[in-house]
Regions:
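Conserved Rossmann-fold SDR core element
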Residues: 18-20, 100-103, 110-122, 164-170
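Conserved NAD(P)H cofactor-binding loop of Rossmann-fold oxidoreductase domains
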Residues: 25-30
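Conserved amphipathic alpha-helix within the SDR
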Residues: 2-17
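Substrate-binding pocket helix/loop in short-chain dehydrogenase/reductase
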Residues: 33-34, 38-44
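C-terminal helical subdomain
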Residues: 119-120, 137-177
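A short, exposed helix-loop element centered on a Lys and neighboring polar residues
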Residues: 57-58, 104
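Catalytic loop of short-chain dehydrogenase/reductase
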Residues: 65-66, 71-112, 121-125
Length: 177
């Protein structure tokens, strides 16, 4: 897996002449309580969410360090330790907060080199396939916002000066207000 990711990053950098932005959007989700979460699913969520974010960022960083306005953007929640975020989905919360911890640590680690590392999270559900297929079907999609709000918010973050805007945990509509 690591070799495949490195090859993909290198191929992309070769094709486009470098890497300016790394968006860690891939995610595995299962909103089950502790007793309902099997370890295979727990491992999958942590491998994709936390480990995948760390590894993808790590492999992109040599290219980002050469870019003019380099950004890493993780789609992960603010580091809010309120137990309500963990109560019914401990495994998923651990995996997503792992992505957020990458923001906290990498933002500080690469601040002096000018690589911005930030997080973006939606205030409410976004109408995606995951929401439809896993979180509640068509009824949930009907009351969800469209993905464009996240795209617009990501654009705002990724066009900011990387030397000045790093280590932030942004909520989509706050950023666009």
């Amino acid at each position: 897996f690591e070799d495949q990711l490195e090859a993909a990053v290198n191929k992309g950098a070769d094709h486009f002449g470098g890497i300016d932005i790394c968006v860690n959007n891939a995610s595995a989700i299962q909103l089950t309580n502790t007793l309902q979460t099997d370890m295979k699913r727990y491992d999958l969520m942590n491998q994709i969410n936390a480990r995948g974010t760390f590894l993808t960022s790590k492999k992109c960083l040599p290219f980002l360090l050469k870019a003019e306005n380099p950004h890493i953007l993780n789609l992960s929640p603010p580091l809010d330790m309120n137990p309500k975020w963990f109560a019914n989905s401990v495994a998923y919360s651990i995996a997503k907060f792992g992505m957020s911890l990458c923001v906290l640590g990498m933002a500080e680690e690469f601040k002096e080199q000018g690589v911005a590392v930030n997080a973006l999270w939606p205030r409410t559900a976004i109408a995606t396939a995951a929401v439809k297929n896993i979180l509640g079907g068509d009824e949930t999609v009907k009351v969800s916002r469209t993905p464009e709000i996240m795209a617009d918010a990501a654009y705002v973050i990724l066009t900011k000066d990387s030397k000045e805007f790093t280590g932030n945990f942004c909520i989509d509509d706050n950023l666009l207000a």
